[in-house]
Amino acid sequence: MSEGSLGDKDSRSGEQLGRRDAGHDTRSSGSSAHAAGPDPASSAGQDDTYALYRRGLDLLGKGSAAAAAQLLARASAAEPESRSILEALGRAQFDTRHYEAAAGSFRRIVDASPSDDYAQFGLGLALARTGDPGAAAEHLALAAAMRPNLRHYTDALRSVRATLSARNRLREETPE
């Protein structure tokens, strides 16, 4: 698996994002549409949005992140508060190296749910890739504090902190 790709949650390490159980959908009064399927009372638009989301996840799982990002962007436009859709969109954007966009998607989740460790992790990785290791370290530290047993969280934090340390040493050694 390449360093910039999204893999399965259980197989990711270092600077990779991956799938997790998506119990964060906010479409139907707090219940997860993933477990129960589409609500029979939902409109055709919501059914279409759910189909876009499921197809986007399928494409993402098969390594077609660019196609997934297109579908997931449409789903997100229809359901802008859905954290499940935003997470999948952020993963697709990260995999297609659209790190600013990925950071934006993960930031929306973090703003709505600061205790979402995976969103903190995704935001941290995306910020690291945009060249902001200071902000990245903050979010990765939060993720690692929330889930210290997840090695890829602590590995990513260690990597970003090493980058910050190296930059600080260079600044100290470089005469102005």
Give each language-model segment a name.
Residues M1-A51, E176:
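Long, contiguous interaction/recruitment modules in multidomain scaffold/adaptor proteins
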Residues S42-A78, D95:
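Alpha-helical segment of the N-proximal tetratricopeptide repeat
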Residues K62-A73, T96-R108, T130-L142, L164-P175:
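Structural signature of tandem alpha-helical TPR/SEL1-like repeats
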